[in-house]
Amino acid sequence: MTDSGWKIILAPEYASEVRKFEEHGTVLSSKDQFHGDIPGFEPFNAGSLIELQLVKYMAKKSCSKSAGHVFSSLSLESGRVVQEMCSDDPNWRPIQAESTAVRMIAHLTAAVFAGRQLCRNSEWIDITIQYSLTAMVAAEQLWRWPRLARRMAARFLPSCRLLSAQVQRANELVSTTSQARKDETTATQQAGMEQSTSYHDGLEWMEEYARGRPYRPGVTQLAVTLGAVDTTKDLLMQVLYDIAGKSDLMDALRREIVAIVSEHGWTKTTIVNLQLMDSMIKESQRLKPVGISKLSGIRRTAASDIHLSDGGIVPKNVPFEISNMHMWDDADLYPDPLSFQADRFLRLRQVPGHEATAQLASLSADHLGWGLGKNACPGRFFVAMEVKVLLCHLILKYDWRLEDGCISEVRRYGTFLSADPEGTLLVRRRREEVDLDGPLV
């Protein structure tokens, strides 16, 4: 029994087997748990609509031919938001880890998927941050009602009314921005001039994929933030907790950044070659999976009976999860599994057969941080780039340590794990060895 109802928990060895059952997708589970058929919860119910295809298309677009433009947007906006959140104060000053991390991640995610105009719109950033929080409260309150009464209850519950208002306002903001772009294009064409502006962002990709088919722009954008902001914020927080105050590790990360930027310049190639940083993030994710529970590396709902190889059956319409505890309690898989070893996966890359699976964005039954199979996190390559670009700015430009008395305990909420939401970090400006804010090369 979990906080959201009965579920079957399967052992880790079933991970590869369940991968074969791709028709048993996560959409069923998400819609059921978050009342996707009730007004206000529309971003949780995009599974059978064009919005889901739009979200997946944008995720692929962000790490394909548009990756260079994505890197440019991430770097430009990282410089802005890091300076805004961390300041240029050379003296130690406290910052609240969660509020700082979520603001930075929401800003960068919007820069790529909603465009520069919306990423610098504080109202839009507030909505993308608050929507998931409101949804969690509203969903929990609706769980207390009988299923048949939930739609009616949502009409008067303040949290549900607020949720609907946030979706409506999101649609208005995105539609207004998209319409302004269309008007600009029309005016350019009427003037007989060639259209020269290409935005290389999610708003453009949505129109490109939809090809005139109707869709809900605000719902689509909120669906993106549901999968991108909270989980990535949580990952960034845990990484900062794990490296803060570790001077030897910070120095090693800085040496790697400086060496590769000096050789390749500040480009997307730099990000690919940051192998120690890549390993460090993956190790942090191993010990504290992001956005998933201690027992839920993979979450599915059976669309039909699933017959397992040992004779076991997962009945139709029953939610099930696969334990990921082997990631931190299996010493045969990961020697000294409870210790944080930043170079663990860097060393694992040298082992034949692990050259690819040891990379941050790779999928493996041994590391379920992103899930597994066709329904694994489609935005993992973008998240890897986003977090690395941001960390380059944060590590090169600032010293970090935990506030005295802060032990950054992982919090458990039902079957979920969360980086300490009350932790405080101390930060001070330092002079970076290479410039990350100049013209990109």
Curated annotation (Swiss-Prot):
<keyword id="KW-0349">Heme</keyword>
<keyword id="KW-0017">Alkaloid metabolism</keyword>
<dbReference type="GO" id="GO:0004497">
    <property type="term" value="F:monooxygenase activity"/>
</dbReference>
<protein>
    <recommendedName>
        <fullName>Cytochrome P450 monooxygenase cpsC</fullName>
        <ecNumber>1.-.-.-</ecNumber>
    </recommendedName>
</protein>
<comment type="pathway">
    <text>Alkaloid biosynthesis.</text>
</comment>
<keyword id="KW-0560">Oxidoreductase</keyword>
<keyword id="KW-0503">Monooxygenase</keyword>
<keyword id="KW-0479">Metal-binding</keyword>
<dbReference type="GO" id="GO:0019748">
    <property type="term" value="P:secondary metabolic process"/>
</dbReference>
<dbReference type="InterPro" id="IPR001128">
    <property type="entry name" value="Cyt_P450"/>
</dbReference>
<dbReference type="GO" id="GO:0005506">
    <property type="term" value="F:iron ion binding"/>
</dbReference>
<dbReference type="GO" id="GO:0009820">
    <property type="term" value="P:alkaloid metabolic process"/>
</dbReference>
<dbReference type="GO" id="GO:0016705">
    <property type="term" value="F:oxidoreductase activity, acting on paired donors, with incorporation or reduction of molecular oxygen"/>
</dbReference>
<feature type="compositionally biased region" description="Polar residues">
    <location>
        <begin position="186"/>
        <end position="195"/>
    </location>
</feature>
<comment type="similarity">
    <text>Belongs to the cytochrome P450 family.</text>
</comment>
<feature type="binding site" description="axial binding residue">
    <location>
        <position position="377"/>
    </location>
    <ligand>
        <name>heme</name>
    </ligand>
</feature>
<dbReference type="Pfam" id="PF00067">
    <property type="entry name" value="p450"/>
</dbReference>
<feature type="region of interest" description="Disordered">
    <location>
        <begin position="175"/>
        <end position="195"/>
    </location>
</feature>
<dbReference type="GO" id="GO:0020037">
    <property type="term" value="F:heme binding"/>
</dbReference>
<comment type="function">
    <text>Cytochrome P450 monooxygenase; part of the gene cluster that mediates the biosynthesis of campesine G, a dimeric indole piperazine alkaloid that shows good insecticidal activity Galleria mellonella. Within the pathway, cpsC catalyzes regioselective dehydrogenation reaction towards C2-N1 of the (2H)-indole ring of campesine D to yield the final product, campesine G. The non-canonical non-ribosomal peptide synthetase cpsA catalyzes the first steps of the pathway by producing L-tryptophanal and L-valinal from their respective amino-acids.</text>
</comment>
<dbReference type="InterPro" id="IPR036396">
    <property type="entry name" value="Cyt_P450_sf"/>
</dbReference>
<keyword id="KW-0408">Iron</keyword>
